[in-house]
């Protein structure tokens, strides 16, 4: 419903060879309030992937946005936990499904939209 909530469906491992394409995909966030990364298709993340996600989170946060995750595999989330990313982003931004994340993003409200 809110045009400022975006969902991206990722597939394949997020490791050093894929981080360039990952970063390029989110080069223009425009007026994105909440970016939901559906991670069901991402079996693993390495330290380069964690760093790319952290940079994306920082960019969104600077503009008042939120990075959210849906359907993340346990192994990928464990890597994010080891890298400190779950603590930085917040456990409240991890969801079982994209639908749940979208509902929550819209419930939280959008600073760009009239309330």
Give a label for each model feature:
Residues 1-115:
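Structured cytosolic domains appended to multi-pass membrane proteins
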